[in-house]
Amino acid sequence: KPVEREELISRIESNLTYSRLAHRHNVSRNVNDNTENSPAYVKAILPRCDNEKDRKFIVKFLDIIESNYQDERFNRSRASELLAMSDRQLNRTLSKLLPDNFTMFLKKYRLEKSMPMLEQGLQITQIAFEVGFGSGAYYSRCFKQVYKVLPSEYEFSQPVETE
């Protein structure tokens, strides 16, 4: 899908800045560093992984989510296939590392990704399709479930709170 030029430049500059700092201070990257441009929801729930295996899993998992969240057909089965693990193993691993199951994580991730578009005043249906929801009505229901208000009524001066 097309990307806004300013957003792409901003992300590249941010990544370059971090790379320079990490190199200068000889800092190894952890999960939180890899999610610098992630939605607030992701930053809020990500644990500091105690071991390298969990850290690598989270980084790979987030890369897969970022690459596929806009596809409305993307689901746990497809994610587990891309991670080369069974659905059950993915469920066990996620329950160990995250407070939400896969479906809720993906839903909240998509909702967070929709916030800038909502703030710009784009139409609900357009936003819904852009972030992987099947319809504007379903997007609105999910938004209300998580934020306790419809997207059309959301005030951007408030801090974002999820359940």
Residues covered by each model-derived region:
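Basic/polar phosphate-binding segments, predominantly the helix-turn-helix DNA-binding elements
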Residues: 76-105, 130-153
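C-terminal output helix
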Residues: 3-12, 16, 24
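Basic, amphipathic alpha-helical hairpins
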Residues: 49, 62-74, 94, 98, ...
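Terminal helix-turn-helix DNA-binding modules in bacterial transcription factors
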Residues: 96-134, 156-163
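CheY-like receiver
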Residues: 19-60
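Short helix/strand-capping hinge loops at secondary-structure junctions
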Residues: 1-2, 19, 68-73, 101-102, ...
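C-terminal end segment of the histidine kinase catalytic
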Residues: 20-26, 139, 161-163
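Heptad-repeat coiled-coil signal-transmission/dimerization helices
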Residues: 8, 12, 58, 65, ...
